[in-house]
Swiss-Prot record:
GO cellular component: chloroplast thylakoid membrane; plasma membrane; proton-transporting ATP synthase complex
One function term, GO molecular function aspect: proton-transporting ATP synthase activity, rotational mechanism
Subcellular location as annotated: Plastid, Chloroplast thylakoid membrane
Lipid bilayer topology: Multi-pass membrane protein
Membrane-traversing stretches: 40-60, 97-117, 136-156, 201-221, 222-242
Matches recorded under Pfam families: ATP-synt_A (PF00119)
Lineage: Eukaryota, Viridiplantae, Streptophyta, Embryophyta, Tracheophyta
Entry superkingdom: Eukaryota
Species of the source: Capsella bursa-pastoris (Shepherd's purse)
Gene3D superfamilies, sorted: ATP synthase, F0 complex, subunit A (1.20.120.220)
SUPFAM superfamilies (alphabetical): F1F0 ATP synthase subunit A
Main location: plastid
Family named by the database record: Belongs to the ATPase A chain family.
Record protein name field: ATP synthase subunit a, chloroplastic
Amino acid sequence: MNVLSCSINTLIKEGLYEISGVEVGQHFYWQIGGFQVHAQVLITSWVVIAILLGSAVLAIRNPQTIPTDGQNFFEFVLEFIRDVSKTQIGEEYGPWVPFIGTLFLFIFVSNWSGALLPWKIIQLPQGELAAPTNDINTTVALALLTSAAYFYAGLSKKGLGYFSKYIQPTPILLPINILEDFTKPLSLSFRLFGNILADELVVVVLVSLVPLVVPIPVMFLGLFTSGIQALIFATLAAAYIGESMEGHH
């Protein structure tokens, strides 16, 4: 009994020691000019982009009148993105389908790559490879693109009259309305970053403590929540664009 107890204690201590070695925020940098660039984020982002471009090429390489399974799948994805865009933006959704679709697919594949691709087997001098959306720089960049998109949508539809929304329904709300436009990208970026980072950390901790069986359901749950996060981001982006074009909150 004492031997069993000692073995369990040893396993727990070893697991905790491994967990203590898990570090968040370690980065491998490239020096480009006078700037430091997060190399691992670029590497994983390029892999995700290559997957998306490769899939698109395969989908449109030989289109059939009677769709094949692969063509059916991509047509279903396109219809889904069009429905999301139309629901949130309205009748003028057409020009925004490529943007919303790109956001959704990039985030979806990025999130899933963190669970399905063996990034950890590639050793870097510092830090490690992970899903692109595991890095706050990626999620902030996506959120800023969304902000630029809804400002462009509003200005292209209404011109400078777009800014009159900041004093509606009363000028007293001017500071709050301005603050709202700053909190939108913040909420988008931190929600996505926090969920993906937390999911990967939970899996790392469980694998360190219990290498078999137990982490598997958590990984499946992570895949599900990763897909939901991509949908939430794309839906909110479309809603913000529609809101800026309609001019109501």
